[in-house]
Amino acid sequence: MTNHESVKWANSGLDLHLELGAGGLRTALEDALRAAIRNGRLPRGTTLPATRVLARDLGVSRGTVLGAYTQLAAEGWLRGRRGSGTVVAFDAGAEARLPAEPQRRFRYDLRPGRPDASSFPRADWLRALRRALAGAPDEAFDYGDPRGREELRRELAAYLRRARGLRVAQDDVVVTSGYTQSLGLIARALAPCRVAMEDPTMPHHRAIVAAAGNEIVSLRVDDDGARVEDLEDAMLVVLTPNRQHPLGMTLSAERRAHLLDWARRRGSFVVADDYDGEFRYDGRPIGPLQGLEPRHVVYAGTASKTLAPGVRLGWLAVPQTLRDRVVEQKQLADWHSGSLEQLALAEFLRSAAYDRHVRKMRLRYRRRRDVLIGALAGRRVRGAAAGLNLYLEVDDEDALVAAAAARGVAVQGAASTGYFAGAPAPGVMVGYAATPEHAFRGAVDAFAAALASVTPRSSAPRG
């Protein structure tokens, strides 16, 4: 344990100043704590006061403090430590290793995981929102069901059965505010436990799981996906089985069978993150793990890739034995997601506008992918069959990221931003969705020039 992990609140000399805004006291407290952690006034390992004590000191209700602590734990800033209360989990000194918005303005955005915001279906969404608002019952404006609006859960269940092949009913669906919250709910519902996570994976996701008080063990990946045969006594496994993020391979049929057999024998759960599953361009669609074993697989989906990250809605298909615990954590986090947004998405799904938009964007992203692959001919490329980005294996990712930045292109290195828990393998994630249509070819040309300036062509691309 390092020195800064034993810091006590009483020794920090910290005063919290709450700036009241439209979000109220709880939001003000969350903002104040985030700021204190981010700027280092509350180092990692600092033990925060008990909720009752801080509520008394600040002159707010205990529920306000509890709600703020719960939300920040879900976001990875705090974690509950048995016998030691709530402690700071985020390390401000390591923030540079996490994926972040570029510190400068780039002409072209080729970072991963971002859809084309300029293609958001504004007219269709506005139409759905108007219909939802006009038809909303009065109780839709009151506190609602933590599971989500019945209208949306019904439409999501129908969509997931039809389009994604799930074995799911309305009562299995829990609506969340996106995958970040979904993962936090499950991590806290099972905490404290041992959680197996892919290596590499998003560092933010590791932070969320750890913040809930869980022990993380890493699962190495190879060309057949996560090495699930290495699983031991974990209670939870978090995977991107259909398209491993960031490397892009698919979990093989043999390993899927091994994983599900393991989960049945041990009574464990698997989170299958289907973060960009609607966008497959080559080969047949891959069936979901949940469709094979709904008693042990939690399916996680989100509107962030199909519509936009600003539509803060996600969904879980949760096994019956885990459902009550997940719903309880959702209620503790924020009670329920926004009712009007839920009703709008329900109408969007019901009217088939969602399907039309996904089909349109799938064709557009496929064309972009083809352009990018053509520019990268002779390079070591992974993950080309699906998704919103490629993984380009390089010898010096920092040099390539810098060369791209010099040409106004934002890309993201994997090793340098903390994706690897073990020995890092250099590579750059190149997104082809976020850049507007009119600028995409210019972005590809600029990135290809950056790549040519730092590394020669080598082996052929890999799918």
Give the ranges of each region predicted by the language model.
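Active-site PLP attachment segment
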Residues: E293-R325, S337-L340
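Conserved core of the PLP fold type I
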Residues: E139-R266, E278-V298, Y365, D396-E397, ...
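Residue-level detector of anion-binding/catalytic polar loops
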Residues: E215, F269, V409-A410
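A generic "structured core" feature
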Residues: T47, D199, H204-I208, L259, ...
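N-terminal basic, amphipathic alpha-helical segments
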Residues: M1-A132, A136, F141, L152, ...
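Short glycine-rich anion-binding loops that position phosphate/pyrophosphate groups of nucleotides
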Residues: G113-D116, P241-H245, K305, T435
